[in-house]
Design a protein with these regions (language model features):
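A preference for well-ordered globular domain cores
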Residues: 1-150
Length: 150
């Protein structure tokens, strides 16, 4: 599991002092720390289990984060990594289904739910396949955000 820590970067006249992050670790370099975002001057960093942080600059006060639902949403909204995950989820969906396809399935799904539409032959199976594909893309995104501690 990944934990999140926070700290404030320190600026001097000649440099910015920031957290020292280790090189990628693990058998295939799959473990690495990720700077998620900075909110109100506080920088949030994802640190996977199994990663040992190097000695840190003494000017920094690094603390573990208690991730509230509100803070989780703020980090997700500000993180370029989460934005990229969202884009890739969309790309995965659009590789098979267009925006028009999605609107079509939404219309017929709502129509059936309200009792104002009856499926034509094959539509129900197509809607089920679409839903499964979208849910697989969403699950991939949740898994990627979980790797970031979100």
């Amino acid at each position: 599991m990944t934990s999140i820590c926070s700290y404030r970067k320190v600026s001097t006249p000649h440099t910015v002092i920031q957290m020292s992050l280790p090189d990628s670790m693990g058998a295939h370099d799959e473990l690495h720390c990720t700077e998620l975002c900075t909110l109100d001057g506080v920088t949030y960093v994802a640190v996977p289990d199994g990663v040992t942080l190097p000695d840190q600059p003494p000017e920094l006060a690094i603390a573990p984060v208690v991730l509230t639902p509100e803070l989780r949403e703020q980090i997700k909204a500000a993180s370029p990594h989460c934005s990229l995950i969202a884009e890739r989820m969309e790309t995965r969906i659009r590789a098979r289904y267009s925006q028009s396809d999605e609107q079509y399935f939404a219309r017929i799904g709502v129509g059936v739910a309200l009792g104002s539409y009856t499926f034509e032959p094959g539509e129900q199976d197509a809607l089920i396949a679409f839903g499964a594909h979208v849910e697989a893309a969403r699950q991939w995104g949740r898994s990627e955000r979980e790797k970031l501690g979100l």
